[in-house]
Amino acid sequence: MNHFLDIHKTDTAELRQMMDSAHAMKAARKGRPKGQLDEDQPLAGRMVALIFEKPSTRTRVSFDVGVRQMGGQTMVLSGKEMQLGHGETIADTARVLSRYVDLIMIRTFEEATLLEMAEHATVPVINGLTNRTHPCQIMADVMTYEEHRGPIAGRKVVWAGDGNNVCASFLHAAGQFGFDFTFTGPSTLDPEAEFVGYAREKGRRVSIERDPAKAVAGADLVVTDTWVSMHDPQSARERRHNQLRPYQVNEALMAQAKPDALFMHCLPAHRDDEATSAVMDGPHSVIFDEAENRLHAQKAIMRWCLGL
């Protein structure tokens, strides 16, 4: 039984195995209707719980479709239905769910909730997102880069904006997949030292550059994310916009990167805030391939968790 909790907690060779599996499964589905089952149906007879303490579109749809394509069934539970940690303990919830399902995916706020779920579950647990990390997204991003440009090892990845949970998982991936990483954004939104330190300990070049044009110079991949959350009050939104406006990914900034550089955004996006529509719909952008690859990467993760 394998939990998928964070990229840095997973063996490098096993990450490579998952990545190769994701590429192969995507290729095998070419030309198939989206509702048609995979030929081998590896999840036939299996039940997967999808827990959403934090709502999502891409995570819910991609996991649900992925399980169904592999022949399994899903049980989708919202935070309101679960009341995680209120009344029944997370530990007891994990033990009970383990009697009903073969695999648990949880998208939650606190990392502690994920870790407690994994500690007490007797079935594999997948991190669908926490406030600290988002490993499933980065597996899809690495897959997308490989699909378009080949190996990501030795490449320069630049993150522009807020050093958030997706940025943190990119730093984990830098250490595991062997690429260099530059963060450009205001000092108040730097990624946590723990994540930067991990990538550096693994021998990767990690730099922080306040000038976005200097940061993006020679980049192979430029990535950004939303500046605000749906839960942020208006005052916080205005403050964030003022802080981050210099780090918008626009055509002038992308022109500083390599001519064949890619642009990614995990979506949903606030168009013309963190990135302009000209970039999002332009020749560097692979955002919709990136979104599709959540499906294939997560299918590979589920197979690995179950030893299939």
Curated annotation (Swiss-Prot):
Gene3D superfamilies documented for this protein: Aspartate/ornithine carbamoyltransferase (3.40.50.1370)
InterPro entries noted in UniProt: Asp/Orn_carbamoyltranf_P-bd (IPR006132), Asp/Orn_carbamoylTrfase (IPR006130), Asp/Orn_carbamoylTrfase_sf (IPR036901), Asp_carbamoyltransf_Asp/Orn-bd (IPR006131), Orn/put_carbamltrans (IPR002292), OTCase_ArgI (IPR024904)
GO cellular component, one term: cytoplasm
Keywords for this protein: Amino-acid biosynthesis, Arginine biosynthesis, Cytoplasm, Transferase
Protein localization: Cytoplasm
Primary location: cytoplasm
GO molecular function: amino acid binding; ornithine carbamoyltransferase activity
Positions of L-ornithine binding: 165, 225, 229-230
Gene Ontology annotations of biological process type: arginine biosynthetic process via ornithine; citrulline biosynthetic process; L-arginine biosynthetic process
EC number(s) on file: 2.1.3.3
Binding-site residues for carbamoyl phosphate, renumbered to this chain: 56-59, 83, 107, 134-137, 266-267, 294
NCBIfam families referenced in this protein's UniProt entry, alphabetically: orni_carb_tr, PRK00779.1
Family per similarity comment: Belongs to the aspartate/ornithine carbamoyltransferase superfamily. OTCase family.
Chain's role: Reversibly catalyzes the transfer of the carbamoyl group from carbamoyl phosphate (CP) to the N(epsilon) atom of ornithine (ORN) to produce L-citrulline.
Protein name: Ornithine carbamoyltransferase
Taxonomic lineage of the native organism: Bacteria, Pseudomonadati, Pseudomonadota, Alphaproteobacteria, Rhodobacterales
